[in-house]
Amino acid sequence: MEETTDFLFFNKYSREFSYHFFGKFFFFKEINTKLIFFFERFNLFSFFTFFSIFILSRNLVHTKNFITALFTYTKATLKKQKKNFFIFFRISFFFVVFLFFYLLFSYTLENIPVSKLFFVWGSWGAFLYIFISGFNFFGKKYTYGKYTEALQRFWKRSFSIFWLIEGFVFSAFIFLTFNASSEVVYSYDPQAFFKLHLISLRFFFFKMLALTFLILCFSMVSSLNLRKRFNMFIFNTTSLFVIIIFLIESDQYISIVNYCGFFEWSFNHSDFALDSDFRKSRTVNSYVLLIGIAKYLHILFIVFVWFFNFAKNLENNESRDYIAGTCTQNAIILYLLNWFAIYPYIKYFFRTYYYSTFSWFFFDFKNESAFNFARFLFNFWSSAFLN
Protein backbone atom coordinates (compact mmCIF):
# COMPACT_ATOMS: atom_id res chain seq x y z
CA MET A 1 0.00 0.00 0.00
CA GLU A 2 1.50 3.33 -1.02
CA GLU A 3 1.90 6.11 1.50
CA THR A 4 0.01 8.51 -0.74
CA THR A 5 -3.18 6.53 -0.20
CA ASP A 6 -2.88 6.70 3.58
CA PHE A 7 -4.70 9.64 5.08
CA LEU A 8 -2.30 11.71 7.25
CA PHE A 9 0.26 8.86 6.83
CA PHE A 10 -1.14 7.34 10.00
CA ASN A 11 -1.25 3.71 8.88
CA LYS A 12 2.53 3.49 8.58
CA TYR A 13 3.19 4.42 12.20
CA SER A 14 0.28 2.34 13.44
CA ARG A 15 1.61 -0.77 11.70
CA GLU A 16 5.10 -0.21 13.11
CA PHE A 17 3.79 0.29 16.64
CA SER A 18 1.57 -2.79 16.43
CA TYR A 19 4.38 -4.96 15.08
CA HIS A 20 7.04 -3.91 17.60
CA PHE A 21 4.75 -3.82 20.64
CA PHE A 22 2.42 -6.80 20.19
CA GLY A 23 5.01 -8.94 18.42
CA LYS A 24 7.08 -9.27 21.62
CA PHE A 25 4.36 -11.22 23.40
CA PHE A 26 3.45 -14.75 22.41
CA PHE A 27 -0.16 -14.28 23.47
CA PHE A 28 -0.61 -11.29 21.17
CA LYS A 29 0.88 -12.82 18.04
CA GLU A 30 -2.52 -13.80 16.65
CA ILE A 31 -3.92 -10.39 17.48
CA ASN A 32 -0.89 -8.82 15.83
CA THR A 33 -1.59 -10.66 12.57
CA LYS A 34 -5.21 -9.57 12.68
CA LEU A 35 -4.24 -5.96 13.27
CA ILE A 36 -1.67 -5.99 10.47
CA PHE A 37 -4.29 -7.47 8.13
CA PHE A 38 -6.76 -4.83 9.25
CA PHE A 39 -4.34 -1.95 8.65
CA GLU A 40 -3.07 -3.23 5.30
CA ARG A 41 -6.25 -4.54 3.70
CA PHE A 42 -8.91 -2.09 4.66
CA ASN A 43 -7.37 1.33 5.19
CA LEU A 44 -10.16 2.05 7.66
CA PHE A 45 -7.93 3.10 10.53
CA SER A 46 -7.23 6.46 8.92
CA PHE A 47 -10.90 7.01 8.20
CA PHE A 48 -12.00 6.38 11.77
CA THR A 49 -9.04 8.36 13.13
CA PHE A 50 -10.00 11.32 11.00
CA PHE A 51 -13.64 10.82 12.00
CA SER A 52 -12.73 10.86 15.71
CA ILE A 53 -10.55 13.96 15.30
CA PHE A 54 -13.35 15.67 13.41
CA ILE A 55 -15.88 14.92 16.15
CA LEU A 56 -13.42 16.04 18.83
CA SER A 57 -12.91 19.33 17.00
CA ARG A 58 -16.66 19.82 16.81
CA ASN A 59 -17.10 19.03 20.49
CA LEU A 60 -14.16 20.88 22.01
CA VAL A 61 -16.51 22.55 24.44
CA HIS A 62 -17.46 19.24 26.07
CA THR A 63 -13.85 18.03 26.13
CA LYS A 64 -12.62 21.29 27.66
CA ASN A 65 -15.37 21.25 30.25
CA PHE A 66 -14.53 17.68 31.19
CA ILE A 67 -10.80 18.38 31.61
CA THR A 68 -11.12 21.73 33.40
CA ALA A 69 -13.89 20.59 35.73
CA LEU A 70 -12.09 17.55 37.15
CA PHE A 71 -11.66 19.19 40.56
CA THR A 72 -14.96 21.05 40.72
CA TYR A 73 -17.30 18.40 42.04
CA THR A 74 -20.23 20.53 43.12
CA LYS A 75 -23.91 19.85 42.91
CA ALA A 76 -24.30 22.51 40.25
CA THR A 77 -21.66 21.05 37.91
CA LEU A 78 -22.10 17.33 38.66
CA LYS A 79 -24.85 16.73 36.10
CA LYS A 80 -23.06 18.77 33.42
CA GLN A 81 -19.76 17.00 34.08
CA LYS A 82 -21.42 13.61 33.83
CA LYS A 83 -22.74 14.55 30.40
CA ASN A 84 -19.31 15.84 29.32
CA PHE A 85 -17.65 12.65 30.56
CA PHE A 86 -19.91 10.36 28.55
CA ILE A 87 -19.49 12.47 25.41
CA PHE A 88 -15.69 12.50 25.85
CA PHE A 89 -15.66 8.75 26.51
CA ARG A 90 -17.73 7.92 23.41
CA ILE A 91 -15.58 10.11 21.16
CA SER A 92 -12.19 9.03 22.54
CA PHE A 93 -12.78 5.29 22.62
CA PHE A 94 -14.86 4.99 19.47
CA PHE A 95 -12.14 3.35 17.42
CA VAL A 96 -10.97 1.14 20.31
CA VAL A 97 -14.46 -0.33 20.64
CA PHE A 98 -14.72 -0.75 16.88
CA LEU A 99 -11.37 -2.56 16.75
CA PHE A 100 -12.40 -4.85 19.61
CA PHE A 101 -15.60 -5.87 17.81
CA TYR A 102 -13.65 -6.39 14.59
CA LEU A 103 -11.26 -8.81 16.32
CA LEU A 104 -14.16 -10.61 17.97
CA PHE A 105 -15.95 -10.84 14.63
CA SER A 106 -12.87 -12.21 12.86
CA TYR A 107 -12.15 -14.87 15.50
CA THR A 108 -15.72 -16.14 15.71
CA LEU A 109 -16.48 -16.10 12.00
CA GLU A 110 -13.23 -17.28 10.47
CA ASN A 111 -13.38 -20.97 11.38
CA ILE A 112 -17.13 -21.54 11.84
CA PRO A 113 -19.08 -23.14 8.99
CA VAL A 114 -22.35 -21.64 7.90
CA SER A 115 -24.32 -24.64 9.16
CA LYS A 116 -22.93 -24.30 12.71
CA LEU A 117 -23.52 -20.58 12.60
CA PHE A 118 -27.19 -21.17 11.73
CA PHE A 119 -27.43 -23.78 14.49
CA VAL A 120 -26.06 -21.36 17.11
CA TRP A 121 -28.38 -18.56 16.00
CA GLY A 122 -31.35 -20.94 15.94
CA SER A 123 -30.54 -22.28 19.42
CA TRP A 124 -30.31 -18.83 20.95
CA GLY A 125 -33.46 -17.75 19.13
CA ALA A 126 -35.38 -20.80 20.40
CA PHE A 127 -34.19 -20.20 23.97
CA LEU A 128 -35.20 -16.54 23.91
CA TYR A 129 -38.53 -17.39 22.25
CA ILE A 130 -39.41 -19.98 24.92
CA PHE A 131 -38.29 -17.68 27.72
CA ILE A 132 -40.17 -14.61 26.47
CA SER A 133 -43.34 -16.44 25.43
CA GLY A 134 -43.45 -18.41 28.67
CA PHE A 135 -43.03 -15.23 30.67
CA ASN A 136 -45.80 -13.47 28.75
CA PHE A 137 -48.35 -16.27 28.75
CA PHE A 138 -47.72 -18.13 32.01
CA GLY A 139 -45.67 -15.94 34.32
CA LYS A 140 -47.38 -12.61 33.80
CA LYS A 141 -50.82 -11.97 35.30
CA TYR A 142 -53.18 -10.39 32.84
CA THR A 143 -55.48 -7.63 34.07
CA TYR A 144 -59.13 -8.11 33.19
CA GLY A 145 -60.48 -5.25 35.30
CA LYS A 146 -63.42 -4.21 33.12
CA TYR A 147 -64.17 -7.69 31.77
CA THR A 148 -66.59 -10.20 33.19
CA GLU A 149 -65.60 -13.53 34.70
CA ALA A 150 -66.93 -15.38 31.65
CA LEU A 151 -64.61 -13.44 29.36
CA GLN A 152 -61.73 -14.12 31.73
CA ARG A 153 -62.35 -17.86 31.54
CA PHE A 154 -62.75 -17.62 27.75
CA TRP A 155 -59.38 -15.93 27.23
CA LYS A 156 -57.55 -18.22 29.64
CA ARG A 157 -58.94 -21.31 27.90
CA SER A 158 -58.16 -19.79 24.50
CA PHE A 159 -54.51 -19.26 25.48
CA SER A 160 -54.29 -22.81 26.83
CA ILE A 161 -55.81 -24.36 23.69
CA PHE A 162 -53.59 -22.20 21.49
CA TRP A 163 -50.39 -23.40 23.16
CA LEU A 164 -51.56 -27.02 23.11
CA ILE A 165 -52.07 -26.79 19.34
CA GLU A 166 -48.75 -24.98 18.99
CA GLY A 167 -46.93 -27.66 20.93
CA PHE A 168 -48.54 -30.45 18.89
CA VAL A 169 -47.61 -28.85 15.56
CA PHE A 170 -43.98 -28.29 16.48
CA SER A 171 -43.71 -31.74 18.08
CA ALA A 172 -44.89 -33.29 14.81
CA PHE A 173 -42.41 -31.16 12.89
CA ILE A 174 -39.54 -32.26 15.16
CA PHE A 175 -40.62 -35.91 14.79
CA LEU A 176 -40.56 -35.68 11.00
CA THR A 177 -37.24 -33.85 11.08
CA PHE A 178 -35.45 -36.48 13.18
CA ASN A 179 -36.96 -39.41 11.28
CA ALA A 180 -36.27 -38.13 7.78
CA SER A 181 -33.21 -38.33 5.56
CA SER A 182 -30.21 -36.04 5.88
CA GLU A 183 -31.68 -33.38 3.60
CA VAL A 184 -35.01 -32.85 5.28
CA VAL A 185 -36.73 -30.17 3.28
CA TYR A 186 -34.58 -29.88 0.19
CA SER A 187 -35.91 -31.62 -2.90
CA TYR A 188 -35.34 -31.44 -6.62
CA ASP A 189 -38.95 -30.33 -7.04
CA PRO A 190 -39.76 -32.17 -10.31
CA GLN A 191 -43.42 -31.11 -10.19
CA ALA A 192 -42.56 -27.43 -9.57
CA PHE A 193 -44.51 -27.59 -6.32
CA PHE A 194 -42.79 -24.67 -4.62
CA LYS A 195 -42.65 -22.50 -7.72
CA LEU A 196 -46.19 -23.01 -9.03
CA HIS A 197 -48.41 -24.11 -6.15
CA LEU A 198 -46.89 -22.82 -2.92
CA ILE A 199 -45.09 -19.53 -3.22
CA SER A 200 -42.84 -17.47 -5.45
CA LEU A 201 -40.11 -15.18 -4.22
CA ARG A 202 -41.82 -12.14 -5.69
CA PHE A 203 -45.05 -12.97 -3.88
CA PHE A 204 -43.12 -13.88 -0.74
CA PHE A 205 -41.38 -10.49 -0.51
CA PHE A 206 -44.67 -8.69 -1.06
CA LYS A 207 -46.29 -10.64 1.78
CA MET A 208 -43.33 -10.15 4.11
CA LEU A 209 -43.43 -6.40 3.46
CA ALA A 210 -47.12 -6.32 4.42
CA LEU A 211 -46.40 -8.46 7.48
CA THR A 212 -43.60 -6.11 8.55
CA PHE A 213 -45.96 -3.14 8.34
CA LEU A 214 -48.51 -5.15 10.33
CA ILE A 215 -46.01 -5.78 13.14
CA LEU A 216 -45.17 -2.07 13.24
CA CYS A 217 -48.87 -1.19 13.36
CA PHE A 218 -49.46 -3.68 16.20
CA SER A 219 -46.64 -2.08 18.17
CA MET A 220 -48.13 1.39 17.60
CA VAL A 221 -51.77 0.73 18.50
CA SER A 222 -50.97 -0.40 22.04
CA SER A 223 -50.54 3.23 23.13
CA LEU A 224 -53.26 4.92 21.04
CA ASN A 225 -56.88 5.79 21.65
CA LEU A 226 -59.66 6.30 19.13
CA ARG A 227 -60.46 9.90 19.98
CA LYS A 228 -58.14 11.28 17.29
CA ARG A 229 -58.77 10.90 13.58
CA PHE A 230 -55.19 9.89 12.74
CA ASN A 231 -55.27 7.13 15.36
CA MET A 232 -58.46 5.84 13.79
CA PHE A 233 -56.66 5.78 10.44
CA ILE A 234 -53.88 3.64 11.97
CA PHE A 235 -56.43 1.20 13.39
CA ASN A 236 -58.17 0.90 10.01
CA THR A 237 -54.83 0.42 8.23
CA THR A 238 -53.93 -2.35 10.67
CA SER A 239 -57.28 -4.04 10.01
CA LEU A 240 -56.64 -3.79 6.25
CA PHE A 241 -53.23 -5.47 6.59
CA VAL A 242 -54.80 -8.21 8.74
CA ILE A 243 -57.41 -8.92 6.04
CA ILE A 244 -54.81 -8.93 3.23
CA ILE A 245 -52.50 -11.38 5.02
CA PHE A 246 -55.48 -13.54 6.02
CA LEU A 247 -56.56 -13.84 2.37
CA ILE A 248 -53.01 -14.67 1.25
CA GLU A 249 -52.49 -17.33 3.92
CA SER A 250 -55.93 -18.82 3.23
CA ASP A 251 -55.17 -19.07 -0.48
CA GLN A 252 -51.83 -20.78 0.17
CA TYR A 253 -53.33 -23.19 2.70
CA ILE A 254 -56.18 -24.18 0.34
CA SER A 255 -53.69 -24.62 -2.51
CA ILE A 256 -51.49 -26.91 -0.40
CA VAL A 257 -54.40 -29.08 0.72
CA ASN A 258 -56.05 -29.37 -2.71
CA TYR A 259 -52.87 -29.95 -4.70
CA CYS A 260 -51.18 -32.57 -2.54
CA GLY A 261 -54.16 -34.47 -1.11
CA PHE A 262 -52.65 -34.81 2.36
CA PHE A 263 -55.76 -36.12 4.06
CA GLU A 264 -55.95 -39.37 2.04
CA TRP A 265 -54.31 -42.00 4.22
CA SER A 266 -52.53 -44.97 2.66
CA PHE A 267 -52.34 -48.06 4.88
CA ASN A 268 -49.89 -49.80 2.58
CA HIS A 269 -47.12 -47.24 2.89
CA SER A 270 -48.04 -45.87 6.35
CA ASP A 271 -47.58 -42.40 4.99
CA PHE A 272 -49.47 -39.66 3.25
CA ALA A 273 -50.66 -40.68 -0.20
CA LEU A 274 -48.83 -38.33 -2.54
CA ASP A 275 -48.19 -38.22 -6.24
CA SER A 276 -44.47 -38.75 -5.84
CA ASP A 277 -42.94 -42.05 -4.69
CA PHE A 278 -39.73 -40.58 -3.34
CA ARG A 279 -39.32 -40.40 0.40
CA LYS A 280 -37.55 -37.07 0.11
CA SER A 281 -40.51 -35.51 -1.68
CA ARG A 282 -42.93 -37.00 0.86
CA THR A 283 -40.92 -35.45 3.68
CA VAL A 284 -40.90 -32.10 1.93
CA ASN A 285 -44.65 -32.12 1.42
CA SER A 286 -45.30 -33.17 5.02
CA TYR A 287 -43.05 -30.37 6.19
CA VAL A 288 -44.94 -27.87 4.03
CA LEU A 289 -48.26 -29.18 5.39
CA LEU A 290 -47.16 -28.60 9.00
CA ILE A 291 -45.90 -25.12 8.21
CA GLY A 292 -49.16 -24.34 6.39
CA ILE A 293 -51.26 -25.53 9.35
CA ALA A 294 -49.17 -23.53 11.81
CA LYS A 295 -49.37 -20.38 9.69
CA TYR A 296 -53.12 -20.73 9.23
CA LEU A 297 -53.70 -21.22 12.96
CA HIS A 298 -51.65 -18.14 13.75
CA ILE A 299 -53.43 -15.93 11.23
CA LEU A 300 -56.82 -17.15 12.49
CA PHE A 301 -55.78 -16.33 16.03
CA ILE A 302 -54.61 -12.87 14.91
CA VAL A 303 -57.88 -12.18 13.06
CA PHE A 304 -60.16 -13.12 15.96
CA VAL A 305 -58.06 -11.43 18.65
CA TRP A 306 -57.51 -8.26 16.63
CA PHE A 307 -61.13 -7.67 15.68
CA PHE A 308 -62.24 -8.44 19.23
CA ASN A 309 -59.68 -5.89 20.41
CA PHE A 310 -60.87 -3.40 17.78
CA ALA A 311 -64.49 -3.81 18.89
CA LYS A 312 -63.60 -3.26 22.54
CA ASN A 313 -61.55 -0.19 21.59
CA LEU A 314 -64.51 1.26 19.70
CA GLU A 315 -66.67 0.64 22.74
CA ASN A 316 -64.34 2.03 25.42
CA ASN A 317 -62.16 4.46 23.38
CA GLU A 318 -58.99 2.91 24.82
CA SER A 319 -56.59 0.16 23.83
CA ARG A 320 -55.67 -3.03 25.62
CA ASP A 321 -51.90 -3.42 25.77
CA TYR A 322 -51.85 -7.16 26.49
CA ILE A 323 -54.21 -7.98 23.58
CA ALA A 324 -52.14 -5.86 21.18
CA GLY A 325 -49.02 -7.59 22.54
CA THR A 326 -50.60 -10.97 21.83
CA CYS A 327 -51.24 -9.94 18.21
CA THR A 328 -47.66 -8.68 17.92
CA GLN A 329 -46.21 -11.94 19.20
CA ASN A 330 -48.31 -14.05 16.86
CA ALA A 331 -47.39 -11.79 13.93
CA ILE A 332 -43.69 -12.31 14.73
CA ILE A 333 -44.23 -16.08 14.86
CA LEU A 334 -46.04 -15.88 11.51
CA TYR A 335 -43.09 -13.90 10.12
CA LEU A 336 -40.67 -16.66 11.16
CA LEU A 337 -42.93 -19.41 9.82
CA ASN A 338 -42.99 -17.74 6.42
CA TRP A 339 -39.20 -17.89 6.35
CA PHE A 340 -39.39 -21.58 7.34
CA ALA A 341 -41.76 -22.20 4.44
CA ILE A 342 -39.18 -21.09 1.86
CA TYR A 343 -36.39 -23.05 3.52
CA PRO A 344 -35.79 -25.01 0.27
CA TYR A 345 -34.90 -21.72 -1.42
CA ILE A 346 -32.57 -20.80 1.43
CA LYS A 347 -30.97 -24.26 1.37
CA TYR A 348 -30.40 -23.97 -2.37
CA PHE A 349 -29.08 -20.46 -1.87
CA PHE A 350 -26.37 -21.57 0.59
CA ARG A 351 -25.79 -25.03 -0.84
CA THR A 352 -22.52 -24.08 -2.52
CA TYR A 353 -21.03 -22.46 0.60
CA TYR A 354 -22.93 -24.40 3.27
CA TYR A 355 -19.98 -26.28 4.82
CA SER A 356 -17.25 -23.83 3.84
CA THR A 357 -15.75 -21.28 6.22
CA PHE A 358 -15.02 -17.62 5.72
CA SER A 359 -11.25 -18.00 6.10
CA TRP A 360 -10.67 -17.01 2.46
CA PHE A 361 -11.98 -13.55 3.29
CA PHE A 362 -9.45 -13.02 6.09
CA PHE A 363 -6.41 -14.45 4.31
CA ASP A 364 -6.86 -13.28 0.74
CA PHE A 365 -9.41 -10.56 0.28
CA LYS A 366 -8.58 -10.13 -3.40
CA ASN A 367 -9.35 -13.76 -4.17
CA GLU A 368 -11.76 -14.36 -7.01
CA SER A 369 -14.01 -16.42 -4.73
CA ALA A 370 -15.36 -13.21 -3.20
CA PHE A 371 -16.33 -11.87 -6.60
CA ASN A 372 -17.73 -15.26 -7.64
CA PHE A 373 -19.85 -15.34 -4.50
CA ALA A 374 -21.19 -11.84 -5.21
CA ARG A 375 -21.87 -12.81 -8.83
CA PHE A 376 -23.68 -15.95 -7.63
CA LEU A 377 -25.91 -13.87 -5.32
CA PHE A 378 -26.73 -11.42 -8.10
CA ASN A 379 -27.59 -14.16 -10.61
CA PHE A 380 -29.74 -16.03 -8.09
CA TRP A 381 -31.88 -13.05 -7.10
CA SER A 382 -32.14 -11.74 -10.67
CA SER A 383 -33.33 -15.13 -11.91
CA ALA A 384 -35.81 -15.33 -9.03
CA PHE A 385 -37.41 -12.03 -9.99
CA LEU A 386 -37.24 -12.41 -13.77
CA ASN A 387 -38.51 -15.98 -14.10
Curated annotation (Swiss-Prot):
Keywords: Mitochondrion. It is found in: Mitochondrion. GO terms for cellular component: mitochondrion. This is Uncharacterized mitochondrial protein ORF14. It comes from Paramecium tetraurelia.
